[in-house]
A protein has these predicted regions:
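Amphipathic alpha-helical segments that form the core helices of the histone-fold
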Residues: 26-48
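Amphipathic alpha-helical oligomerization segments
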Residues: 2-25, 46-54
Length: 54
């Protein structure tokens, strides 16, 4: 069973990096990558059904 929370965090960190931001720089009191969590969650949730088809 995939660890969805870890996948969402990894995706958020990747989205942050691809936008050219350091992952752990502070933004509104939290690491910058956390501001990408909503987008990462949408992407992972969209992909999961296709990964589970096998």
């Amino acid at each position: 069973m995939p660890d969805v929370e870890k996948a969402i965090e990894a995706a958020a960190r990747a989205l942050c990096r691809i936008d050219g931001h350091p992952e752990n720089i502070r933004f509104e009191g939290k690491p910058m990558w956390q501001s990408y969590l909503p987008a990462a969650k949408v992407v992972i949730e969209a992909a999961l059904p296709h990964l589970r088809e096998n």
